[in-house]
Amino acid sequence: MEEMKILMMNNPWILTATATTLLISIFLFFTRKSSKMVWPAGPKTLPIIGNMHLLGGTALQVVLHNLAKVHGSVMTIWIGSWRPVIVVSDIERAWEVLVNKSSDYSARDMPDITKIISADWKTISTSDSGPHWTNLRKGLQNVALSPHNLAAQFQFQEKDMTKMIQTLEEEARNNNGIVKPLDHMKKATLRLISRLVFGQDFNNDKYVDDMHLAIEELIRVSGYARLAEAFYYAKYLPSHKKAVREVEEAQRRVQNLVSPFLSLNPPTNTYLHFLRSQKYDDEVIIFAIFEAYLLGVDSTSLTTAWALAFLIREPNVQEKLYQELESFASKNDRRILKVEDINKLQYLQAVIKETMRMKPIAPLAIPHKACRDTSLMGKKIDKGTRVMVNIFALHHNKNVFNDPFKFMPERFMKVDSQDANGKAMEQSLLPFSAGMRICAGMELGKLQFSFALANLAYAFKWSCVADGVLPDMSDQLGFVLLMKTPLEARINRRN
């Protein structure tokens, strides 16, 4: 929402359009289809902007978390004067939406601009549930991301990790010990996804570099989509038209990048083979592939970067993690930790869970939409109603997580799922959402994140670039939870 405020202040067209459409917006407000649905209470609205005056100043998920303390864990927020959304910040109601009535709330409500880079909303994350969505999701999970296929990637992931460690060492030597690890992690994940899409023999560094740039460019222009959705007539403004042109340029870049590979004869265990076998249009195939990169690369790499930032800020946690990794590596004669080792490392798993709790990569998930008339808390919900679950709020519930704003992996070391509090912690930790629309790439994401963090924490001691200059933990919301200031760190080789 901070992007919206900046755009409004710097763009007189938006203010002009707001004034000229006041009467039309009021007309739309009072002539909406009548319904017996009663919207949950929420903060008082202003004409045209709804609650947007309350949503700036800090991260949106934090603002909504604080508003929920005043207006209730199920409240209505108006993004502009015509786009109400129910925001859920309570685990019981979140499970009602995400799990117990998963099929009722399984539709999507996406900004129009996203049609351009999703083949008209025909990708897994953008399409409503139905036969197409089910088939596409099963193909990704049962073919490209099958356990057998992921296991076949282990040797390649380990080679990529060895290369990454060497590259980081070289960067540190040339830069007084300081590195910027994020791009290195992104490219390792890009290579992994490329092999799952095209086959194990795929090795094209130019493609990896170009895809990396395409993702970065799309993330850069993504913020405007929320503004256009808030103001109905913003889509007619020059600034919005400029954003559309930029997304269309990104669309062409992706098409030109992926389309030459559609004529390959890929192995049967690849995502490309599955997509072609379903006789999908080339446009659907291209953007189903792009979606795997868009949602997989930054989410995994940024979560690893957040974890490293926490380890720098909490040296005792970093040392405790290193001791576990070093002990295991010594006993098992490891130069690098292997993918199959990851689940045997208890403290590593606790650090991973705590990182995902503190910095969920999609803190507001992707908004759900009721695909039929249903209910919430026993009250009627109309078909088409938008519902957003604030994952951040669930993860920072002080009644579930003691001292919730403190990074404390130990909280996950002795969780008893039979204990009431342990069960509440398990149910409240939803970094990948839950229910039928849970992240399709969850297992791959957890695997790559865990593997990367284990080896980077084992290979190097991570510290501040200068004494007292701690990593900036402020974030900004795009497709995923971005670092406002990308991580820089000083590294020293441990082994």
From Swiss-Prot:
What GO biological process, any one, is recorded here?
Answer: isoquinoline alkaloid biosynthetic process
Q: Which cysteines are joined by disulfide bonds?
A: none
Residues engaged in binding heme: C439
> In which tissues does this protein get expressed?
Expressed in roots and at lower levels in stems and leaves.
Q: How does it sit in the membrane?
A: Single-pass membrane protein
What Enzyme Commission number(s) apply to this enzyme?
1.14.19.64
Q: Which reaction does it catalyse?
A: (S)-cheilanthifoline + reduced [NADPH--hemoprotein reductase] + O2 = (S)-stylopine + oxidized [NADPH--hemoprotein reductase] + 2 H2O + H(+)
> Main EC class of this protein?
oxidoreductase
Q: Where are the transmembrane segments?
A: 11-31
Stimuli inducing this protein: Up-regulated by methyl jasmonate treatment.
UniProt GO cellular component terms: endoplasmic reticulum membrane
Recall the GO molecular function terms of this protein's record: (S)-stylopine synthase activity; heme binding; iron ion binding; monooxygenase activity
Q: Which cofactors does this gene product need?
A: heme
Which UniProt keyword terms apply here?
Answer: Endoplasmic reticulum, Heme, Iron, Membrane, Metal-binding, Monooxygenase, Oxidoreductase, Transmembrane, Transmembrane helix
Which pathway is this protein engaged in?
Alkaloid biosynthesis
Where located? Answer: Endoplasmic reticulum membrane
Give the highest taxon in the source lineage: Eukaryota
The Swiss-Prot or TrEMBL record describes its family as follows: Belongs to the cytochrome P450 family.
- Report the PANTHER family cross-referenced here: CYTOCHROME P450 98A9 (PTHR47944), OS09G0441700 PROTEIN (PTHR47944:SF4)
Functional description taken from the UniProt entry: Methylenedioxy bridge-forming cytochrome P450 involved in the biosynthesis of isoquinoline alkaloids. Converts (R,S)-cheilanthifoline to (S)-stylopine with a high substrate specificity. Catalyzes an oxidative reaction that does not incorporate oxygen into the product.
Spell out the protein name for this chain. Answer: (S)-stylopine synthase 1
